Amino acid sequence: MENTHSMISFKTLNKLKIQQLFSIKNKSFYSTSSPISSTVNSSGNDNIDIENDKEIKKKNRLIVKDLYKQLMYLGRVGFLGVDYIRDKAKPQFISNANLTDNNKINECIERTKYVIKEIEAMNRFHKYRNLKKSYDLEFQKVNDNFLNLDNDQNKIK
């Protein structure tokens, strides 16, 4: 019980960090000009653009770490297991660790969110299927007993 409480507080801490990064004012993360062209400007805004780029990298790093943690949690909770998910996810995360283009990073983030939703759906389906199996056997026994009672009463008459 204490483990889940500490894990929840850790997740909320990560969410707060991400919210703080999104709510930074006077700095737009998605400017219309490319980062390379904006750093070449001689208007004196070079320092702001570099900070902007650092903020974007920091935000993406937090998001990716949170997604990896969600995958590990799903492995712990679900029927696949942590080892299976880690063996599949870690090479993918490592192969994409050197990406620098924000569009490609966002594509990978969206793909990971999709995979998380699919794993959640698989876990729910697995749970539903197991519950259905257990109840089907129970109801089958009840129905068999009920039918046996009907047959016994018909024999008595």
UniProtKB/Swiss-Prot annotation:
InterPro entries in UniProt: Complex1_LYR_ETFRF1_LYRM5 (IPR045296), ETFRF1 (IPR052000)
**Similarity comment:** Belongs to the complex I LYR family.
Name under which the protein is recorded: Electron transfer flavoprotein regulatory factor 1 homolog
Q: What is the source species?
A: Dictyostelium discoideum
Q: Which gene encodes it?
A: etfrf1
Q: Give the record's keywords alphabetically.
A: Mitochondrion
Chief subcellular location: mitochondrion
| GO annotation, biological process | negative regulation of oxidative phosphorylation; respiratory electron transport chain
Name its cellular compartments. Answer: Mitochondrion
- Quote the cellular component terms of the Gene Ontology held in the record: mitochondrion
